């Protein structure tokens, strides 16, 4: 091991250890949240660098998004006494329960970070050399991915041009997609397309994928809908890191500039009339707090549990599986989400949900520990598949798991099952094509 690598490992170990001690100090009222937050930010940065060097791309992108969505408000709170200054309505979920929220979110992210570091340092498995970005993967998966991307583009433009999808404001956009059930499946296949394409693309062809994706990305950003961009793009970034793609500094700067300036500008500009353009006021923390607002469901969940509601011991994770089997097993009744405590979309309409909140609702702090450990092990396993076909499947599933960070688990099993079915079909087609080519 080179001296530089040894120094990085030592620094990383020290930052992780310091974060653990500061968190323990916070739990014992010896240290303030600002010290813990700053310490955790440094630890996350060092862990991300280590994961990048070790090509653990899926762990890296999941950790980054998990941190942003659950710590965006706390990071802003370091600089502002009122991080939710741009928000109105009932904010008691944060201000009444801040300490508890901070403790749970810190525990979850610190658990994920510690285990990611442990695996990166002690795991001897590395991504296969044939995955290198200079090599091209499976052609059928690659072109299927492009087909899915183009197919969604056509669907998206059709909905806009026919007036069925309103994009004037984000509110109009959200309202109109409720009336378009096929739109959500289009988004899903769009994310699969990105996963398949980037898992198999050769370095010299990445620019063509960027050109194909640009129209959809711009339209999503203009509507204020960043989720449909972040989920698949983060999974694509993850697989590129697994495939040893070198991230340039200008890419990081462009991402930060887009996140903190371009997107807030679009958001403000789209909600203003021409007479008030000179009054545009963009706050640096707007995007950070908006992403971090995913913390809100955790605030409600802790309130439910503290109010005497019982934890459900994994029932919200088993419910979607039960619903799938209810179609094929006679007498097995599907779960009616409107009648159970874990019908989150009915209890908190329009909020999405939170992966940490759901884990806490199922098993309190032990549930959070179990879910974080399982996620790390799963994402690590996905990194170590030995074929482009399995890598494609892994990347698509990672996109679903990233989506789950800001949503309930209820959709995850069905989406994963669809991905597996598509992969199996493509494997049969690919095998048939290769046999025919050999016969000729």
Model segments located where?
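Small-residue-enriched transmembrane helix-hairpin modules in multi-pass membrane proteins
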Residues: 170-177, 262-376
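Hydrophobic alpha-helical segments
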Residues: 348-440
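Hydrophobic alpha-helical membrane-insertion segments
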Residues: 57-73, 144-155, 256-265, 314, ...
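Hydrophobic alpha-helical transmembrane segments
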Residues: 99-112, 179-191, 209-211, 230, 252-254, 296-303, 369-370, ...
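Membrane-embedded catalytic interface detector for glycan/lipid assembly enzymes
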Residues: 27-34, 84-95, 116-243, 260-274, ...
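N-terminal "leader" segments that precede or initiate the main folded domain
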Residues: 1-122, 213-216, 232-262, 410-428, ...
């Amino acid at each position: 091991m080179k001296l530089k690598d040894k120094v990085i490992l030592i620094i990383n170990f020290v930052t992780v250890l310091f974060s653990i001690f500061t968190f323990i100090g916070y739990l014992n009222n010896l240290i303030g949240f600002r010290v813990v937050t700053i310490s955790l930010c440094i630890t996350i940065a060092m862990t991300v660098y280590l994961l990048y060097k070790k090509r653990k791309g899926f762990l890296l992108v999941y950790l980054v998004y998990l941190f942003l969505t659950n710590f965006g408000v706390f990071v802003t709170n370091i600089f502002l006494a009122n991080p939710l200054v741009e928000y109105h309505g009932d904010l008691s979920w944060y201000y009444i329960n801040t300490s508890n929220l901070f403790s749970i979110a810190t525990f979850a992210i610190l658990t994920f970070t510690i285990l990611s570091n442990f695996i990166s340092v002690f795991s001897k498995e590395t991504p296969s050399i044939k995955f290198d970005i200079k090599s091209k993967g499976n052609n059928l998966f690659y072109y299927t991915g492009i087909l899915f991307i183009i197919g969604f583009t056509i669907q998206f433009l059709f909905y806009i041009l026919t007036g069925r999808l309103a994009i004037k404001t984000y509110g109009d956009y959200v309202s109109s997609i409720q009336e378009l059930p096929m739109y959500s499946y289009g988004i899903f296949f769009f994310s699969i397309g990105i996963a398949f394409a980037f898992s198999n693309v050769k370095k010299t062809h990445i620019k063509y994928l960027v050109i194909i994706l640009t129209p959809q990305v711009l339209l999503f950003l203009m509507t204020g809908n960043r989720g449909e961009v972040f989920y698949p793009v983060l999974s694509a970034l993850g697989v590129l890191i697994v495939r040893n793609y070198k991230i340039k500094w200008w890419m990081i700067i462009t991402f930060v500039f887009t996140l903190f300036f371009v997107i807030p500008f679009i958001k403000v500009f789209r909600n203003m009339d021409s007479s008030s353009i000179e009054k545009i006021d963009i706050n640096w923390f707007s995007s950070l707090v908006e992403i971090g607002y995913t913390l809100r469901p955790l605030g409600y969940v802790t309130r439910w549990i503290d109010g005497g509601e019982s934890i459900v011991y994994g029932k919200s994770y088993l419910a979607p599986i039960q619903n799938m089997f209810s179609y094929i097993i006679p007498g097995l009744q599907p779960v009616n989400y409107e009648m159970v405590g874990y019908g989150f979309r009915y209890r908190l309409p329009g909020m999405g949900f939170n992966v940490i909140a759901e884990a806490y609702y199922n098993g309190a702090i032990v549930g959070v520990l179990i879910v974080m450990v399982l996620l790390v092990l799963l994402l690590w396993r996905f990194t170590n598949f030995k074929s482009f076909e399995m890598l494609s499947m892994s990347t698509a599933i990672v996109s679903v798991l990233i989506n789950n960070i800001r949503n309930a688990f209820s959709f995850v099993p069905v989406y994963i099952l669809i991905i597996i079915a598509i992969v199996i079909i493509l494997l049969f087609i690919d095998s048939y094509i290769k046999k025919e080519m050999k016969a000729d």
